[in-house]
Amino acid sequence: MNVLRKIVKKCRDEDTQKPSPVSAPPYDDDLWLPPPEYVPLKELTSKKNMRNFCVNGEVKACSPNGYSFRILRHILGSFNEIYSGNHRMIGLVKVVVGLALSGAPVPEGMNWVYKLRRTLIFQWADSRGPLEGEELEYSQEITWDDDTEFVGLQIRVGARQCHIQGRIWCINSNSRACQLWSDMSLQTQRSEEDKDSSLLLE
Protein backbone atom coordinates (compact mmCIF):
# COMPACT_ATOMS: atom_id res chain seq x y z
CA MET A 1 0.00 0.00 0.00
CA ASN A 2 1.36 3.37 -0.95
CA VAL A 3 1.83 5.69 2.00
CA LEU A 4 2.05 9.46 1.77
CA ARG A 5 5.08 10.67 3.64
CA LYS A 6 7.50 13.54 3.87
CA ILE A 7 11.00 12.45 2.97
CA VAL A 8 14.42 14.00 2.63
CA LYS A 9 14.57 13.82 -1.16
CA LYS A 10 14.56 17.29 -2.77
CA CYS A 11 13.67 18.61 -6.20
CA ARG A 12 16.89 19.74 -7.85
CA ASP A 13 17.09 22.30 -10.63
CA GLU A 14 20.29 20.82 -12.00
CA ASP A 15 21.86 17.40 -12.09
CA THR A 16 25.60 16.84 -12.40
CA GLN A 17 24.80 13.75 -14.44
CA LYS A 18 22.73 13.85 -17.59
CA PRO A 19 19.41 15.42 -16.52
CA SER A 20 16.29 13.36 -17.04
CA PRO A 21 13.83 14.95 -19.46
CA VAL A 22 10.69 16.23 -17.74
CA SER A 23 7.46 15.38 -19.48
CA ALA A 24 4.70 17.96 -19.65
CA PRO A 25 1.45 16.93 -17.99
CA PRO A 26 -0.73 15.17 -20.57
CA TYR A 27 -3.53 17.12 -22.20
CA ASP A 28 -6.21 14.75 -21.05
CA ASP A 29 -9.52 15.78 -19.53
CA ASP A 30 -9.02 13.53 -16.54
CA LEU A 31 -5.54 14.83 -15.83
CA TRP A 32 -5.31 18.43 -16.99
CA LEU A 33 -7.25 21.36 -15.58
CA PRO A 34 -8.13 24.33 -17.81
CA PRO A 35 -8.01 27.86 -16.35
CA PRO A 36 -10.40 28.43 -13.42
CA GLU A 37 -13.82 29.97 -13.84
CA TYR A 38 -14.89 32.91 -11.71
CA VAL A 39 -18.47 33.78 -10.90
CA PRO A 40 -18.78 37.58 -10.55
CA LEU A 41 -20.46 38.93 -7.44
CA LYS A 42 -23.86 40.51 -8.14
CA GLU A 43 -25.11 41.25 -4.69
CA LEU A 44 -23.82 40.36 -1.24
CA THR A 45 -26.31 40.70 1.60
CA SER A 46 -23.77 40.69 4.42
CA LYS A 47 -20.19 41.96 4.49
CA LYS A 48 -19.56 40.91 8.08
CA ASN A 49 -17.00 38.20 7.40
CA MET A 50 -15.81 39.31 3.96
CA ARG A 51 -12.20 40.39 3.49
CA ASN A 52 -9.96 41.25 0.56
CA PHE A 53 -6.66 39.41 0.42
CA CYS A 54 -3.73 40.05 -1.87
CA VAL A 55 -2.48 36.53 -2.42
CA ASN A 56 0.49 35.05 -4.19
CA GLY A 57 1.08 31.37 -4.56
CA GLU A 58 3.75 29.21 -6.13
CA VAL A 59 3.68 25.44 -6.55
CA LYS A 60 6.73 23.64 -7.92
CA ALA A 61 6.04 20.12 -9.10
CA CYS A 62 9.11 17.95 -9.55
CA SER A 63 8.98 14.52 -11.12
CA PRO A 64 11.72 13.13 -13.39
CA ASN A 65 9.20 11.00 -15.29
CA GLY A 66 6.35 13.49 -15.52
CA TYR A 67 3.21 13.32 -13.43
CA SER A 68 -0.57 13.33 -13.64
CA PHE A 69 -3.16 15.24 -11.69
CA ARG A 70 -4.39 11.93 -10.30
CA ILE A 71 -1.17 11.81 -8.25
CA LEU A 72 -1.48 15.46 -7.22
CA ARG A 73 -5.07 14.92 -6.09
CA HIS A 74 -3.92 11.90 -4.10
CA ILE A 75 -1.16 13.92 -2.43
CA LEU A 76 -3.42 16.88 -1.69
CA GLY A 77 -6.15 14.55 -0.41
CA SER A 78 -4.20 14.33 2.87
CA PHE A 79 -3.60 18.09 3.02
CA ASN A 80 -5.53 18.60 6.27
CA GLU A 81 -3.30 16.13 8.10
CA ILE A 82 0.05 17.39 6.78
CA TYR A 83 -0.60 21.15 6.51
CA SER A 84 1.93 22.98 8.69
CA GLY A 85 0.67 26.56 8.36
CA ASN A 86 -1.86 28.73 10.17
CA HIS A 87 -5.01 26.60 10.37
CA ARG A 88 -7.26 29.65 10.34
CA MET A 89 -6.10 30.11 6.74
CA ILE A 90 -6.18 26.52 5.52
CA GLY A 91 -9.25 27.15 3.34
CA LEU A 92 -7.58 30.14 1.69
CA VAL A 93 -4.41 28.11 1.08
CA LYS A 94 -6.43 25.30 -0.55
CA VAL A 95 -8.10 27.74 -2.92
CA VAL A 96 -4.80 29.42 -3.85
CA VAL A 97 -3.06 26.08 -4.43
CA GLY A 98 -5.99 24.83 -6.49
CA LEU A 99 -6.06 27.97 -8.63
CA ALA A 100 -2.29 27.92 -9.11
CA LEU A 101 -2.36 24.30 -10.27
CA SER A 102 -5.14 25.11 -12.73
CA GLY A 103 -2.91 27.59 -14.56
CA ALA A 104 -0.19 27.04 -17.11
CA PRO A 105 3.12 25.66 -15.78
CA VAL A 106 6.50 27.14 -16.68
CA PRO A 107 9.43 24.70 -16.95
CA GLU A 108 12.31 25.54 -14.60
CA GLY A 109 15.10 22.99 -14.60
CA MET A 110 13.66 19.73 -13.32
CA ASN A 111 10.53 21.48 -12.07
CA TRP A 112 7.21 22.63 -13.44
CA VAL A 113 6.32 25.93 -11.76
CA TYR A 114 2.77 27.21 -11.30
CA LYS A 115 2.36 30.78 -10.05
CA LEU A 116 -0.65 32.81 -8.99
CA ARG A 117 -0.83 36.47 -7.99
CA ARG A 118 -4.34 37.82 -7.47
CA THR A 119 -6.50 39.97 -5.26
CA LEU A 120 -9.39 37.79 -4.14
CA ILE A 121 -12.27 38.40 -1.77
CA PHE A 122 -12.90 35.60 0.70
CA GLN A 123 -15.84 35.16 3.03
CA TRP A 124 -15.68 32.93 6.10
CA ALA A 125 -18.56 31.32 7.97
CA ASP A 126 -19.40 32.12 11.59
CA SER A 127 -16.50 34.53 12.13
CA ARG A 128 -13.97 31.82 11.32
CA GLY A 129 -10.90 32.31 9.22
CA PRO A 130 -7.94 34.60 9.97
CA LEU A 131 -8.04 37.30 12.60
CA GLU A 132 -8.37 40.92 11.54
CA GLY A 133 -5.06 42.08 10.06
CA GLU A 134 -3.53 38.60 10.20
CA GLU A 135 -1.07 37.72 7.43
CA LEU A 136 0.23 34.41 6.14
CA GLU A 137 3.63 33.30 4.90
CA TYR A 138 3.45 29.56 4.37
CA SER A 139 5.91 27.18 2.74
CA GLN A 140 6.09 23.40 2.81
CA GLU A 141 7.54 20.56 0.80
CA ILE A 142 5.41 17.46 0.31
CA THR A 143 6.68 14.40 -1.51
CA TRP A 144 5.24 11.16 -2.81
CA ASP A 145 7.64 8.29 -3.33
CA ASP A 146 7.03 4.63 -4.05
CA ASP A 147 8.76 1.91 -6.03
CA THR A 148 7.73 3.33 -9.39
CA GLU A 149 7.58 7.12 -9.20
CA PHE A 150 8.56 10.22 -7.29
CA VAL A 151 6.61 13.48 -7.19
CA GLY A 152 7.63 16.44 -5.05
CA LEU A 153 5.53 19.54 -4.39
CA GLN A 154 7.08 22.71 -3.04
CA ILE A 155 4.25 25.02 -1.96
CA ARG A 156 4.56 28.69 -1.03
CA VAL A 157 1.56 30.90 -0.29
CA GLY A 158 1.52 34.49 0.94
CA ALA A 159 -1.63 36.38 1.91
CA ARG A 160 -2.25 39.77 3.44
CA GLN A 161 -5.34 41.89 3.78
CA CYS A 162 -5.54 44.69 1.25
CA HIS A 163 -8.08 47.26 0.19
CA ILE A 164 -7.81 47.21 -3.57
CA GLN A 165 -10.65 45.79 -5.61
CA GLY A 166 -10.67 42.02 -5.82
CA ARG A 167 -12.67 39.23 -7.41
CA ILE A 168 -15.00 37.11 -5.37
CA TRP A 169 -13.93 33.50 -4.96
CA CYS A 170 -17.13 31.63 -5.79
CA ILE A 171 -17.64 27.96 -6.40
CA ASN A 172 -18.92 27.07 -9.85
CA SER A 173 -19.66 23.37 -9.73
CA ASN A 174 -18.90 23.05 -13.45
CA SER A 175 -15.39 24.48 -13.06
CA ARG A 176 -12.57 21.95 -13.30
CA ALA A 177 -10.56 24.11 -10.91
CA CYS A 178 -13.23 23.68 -8.27
CA GLN A 179 -13.40 19.94 -8.89
CA LEU A 180 -9.75 19.63 -7.85
CA TRP A 181 -10.89 19.95 -4.23
CA SER A 182 -14.40 18.49 -4.61
CA ASP A 183 -13.55 15.27 -2.77
CA MET A 184 -11.65 17.00 0.01
CA SER A 185 -12.56 18.89 3.16
CA LEU A 186 -13.09 22.26 1.50
CA GLN A 187 -16.87 22.68 1.35
CA THR A 188 -19.13 25.56 0.47
CA GLN A 189 -22.54 26.74 1.51
CA ARG A 190 -24.66 28.83 -0.81
CA SER A 191 -28.08 30.30 -0.20
CA GLU A 192 -30.48 31.91 -2.64
CA GLU A 193 -29.72 35.30 -1.09
CA ASP A 194 -25.95 34.83 -1.35
CA LYS A 195 -25.90 32.71 -4.47
CA ASP A 196 -22.90 34.60 -5.88
CA SER A 197 -20.74 34.37 -2.79
CA SER A 198 -19.06 31.44 -1.13
CA LEU A 199 -18.24 30.52 2.45
CA LEU A 200 -15.09 28.63 3.26
CA LEU A 201 -15.90 26.21 6.05
CA GLU A 202 -12.91 25.29 8.16
From Swiss-Prot:
Protein's recorded name: Matrix protein
Lineage: Viruses, Riboviria, Orthornavirae, Negarnaviricota, Haploviricotina
Site (Involved in the inhibition of stress granules formation and contributes therefore to virulence): 95
Pfam family, one: Rhabdo_M2
Organism from which the protein derives: Rabies virus (strain CVS-11)
General remark: Most abundant protein in the virion.
Membrane topology: Peripheral membrane protein
Keyword Mitochondrion: no
Family label: Belongs to the lyssavirus matrix protein family.
UniProt xrefs under Gene3D superfamilies: Rhabdovirus matrix protein M2 (3.10.460.20)
Cellular localisation: Virion membrane; Host endomembrane system; Host cytoplasm
Gene, per the UniProt record: M
